[in-house]
């Protein structure tokens, strides 16, 4: 099985909250696609609650689009990581890490401003596979944690696993 890019970085050295360019690629027509690792908490140390991350999934995707889309940038998808330490965001374009970080912080402020659980988008049995597994309170706690900590940048060169380590795993 091929080694995926996300497993060539040292998760023990990742800062969080932090933005990392996980991958650059181009479509056959030449459009730039960038995949970002939006690391909310330190791998193997913290984990996002399942209700909190699920509610963030519903809110974060829309709020990030409001703050980041435009000027040659269009978000394709924002999905939670299986390890529940963050999200992957795929988009058309190549925004800077600082622009992504600023948009992320603005989106977290938006999350804290949601007034009621009924204001969570697509919160119904027709549009959500586990519509009862949500917590606005937990999502807002996560958002406040991100705002308080700020968002830094993880550089791939600083996190790259050596061939020796990879060979021994």
From Swiss-Prot:
GO terms for molecular function: iron ion binding; S-ribosylhomocysteine lyase activity. Homodimer. Fe cation binds at residues 54, 58, 128. Belongs to the LuxS family. It catalyses: S-(5-deoxy-D-ribos-5-yl)-L-homocysteine = (S)-4,5-dihydroxypentane-2,3-dione + L-homocysteine. Its cofactor is Fe cation. GO terms for biological process: quorum sensing. Binds 1 Fe cation per subunit. Keywords: Autoinducer synthesis, Iron, Lyase, Metal-binding, Quorum sensing. This is S-ribosylhomocysteine lyase. It holds the Pfam family LuxS. Its EC number is 4.4.1.21. Involved in the synthesis of autoinducer 2 (AI-2) which is secreted by bacteria and is used to communicate both the cell density and the metabolic potential of the environment. The regulation of gene expression in response to changes in cell density is called quorum sensing. Catalyzes the transformation of S-ribosylhomocysteine (RHC) to homocysteine (HC) and 4,5-dihydroxy-2,3-pentadione (DPD).
């Amino acid at each position: 099985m091929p080694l995926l890019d996300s497993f060539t970085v040292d998760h023990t050295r990742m800062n969080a909250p932090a933005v990392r360019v996980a991958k650059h690629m181009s479509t056959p027509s030449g459009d730039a696609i960038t995949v970002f690792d939006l690391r909310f908490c330190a791998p193997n140390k913290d984990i996002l609650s399942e209700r909190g991350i699920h509610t963030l999934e519903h809110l974060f995707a829309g709020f990030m689009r409001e703050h980041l889309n435009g000027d040659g940038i269009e978000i394709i998808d924002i999905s939670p990581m299986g390890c529940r330490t963050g999200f992957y965001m795929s988009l058309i374009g190549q925004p800077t890490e600082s622009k992504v970080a600023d948009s992320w912080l603005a989106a977290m402020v938006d999350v804290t401003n949601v007034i009621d659980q009924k204001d969570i988008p697509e919160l119904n049995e027709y549009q959500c596979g586990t519509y009862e597994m949500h917590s606005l309170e937990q999502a807002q706690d996560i958002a406040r944690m991100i705002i308080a900590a700020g968002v830094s940048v993880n550089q791939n060169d600083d996190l790259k696993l050596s061939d020796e380590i990879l060979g021994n795993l």
